[in-house]
Amino acid sequence: MSKLKKRKGDEGESIASNFLISLDHEILKRNYRFLHCEIDIISVKEEVLYFSEVKFWKEFKFFDPRFTFNLAKQTKMRKAAKGFLAENLSFQNHFVSFCLVSVNEKKGCKYYLDLF
């Protein structure tokens, strides 16, 4: 991954983390890796565990960012979530939500819950 792409991703994840904190989420992990799978942000609010993908665009895009969740991405997120739950047994009884935080430099953040 290029340094520019990594820096852009880190910036988007920082904005998304602050956005989730403003919604009373507790951030548990950022860039959680399990095998070859990654989840950008893992957070918890009440009894729900949120596994969130972050998409960051500097300019406005005329498409629905939820379409970035193809079957391969869903499979990898599920695998990473199972790994996190196996490593963190205290969250075994929480509800789980797979989400997207779309970050646009001009429009702010939009949060999509329960995508799959």
Curated annotation (Swiss-Prot):
InterPro entries: Restrct_endonuc-II-like, tRNA_endonuc-like_dom_sf, UPF0102_YraN-like. Gene3D superfamilies: 3.40.1350.10. One of its GO terms (molecular function) is nucleic acid binding. Belongs to the UPF0102 family. This is UPF0102 protein LA_2381.
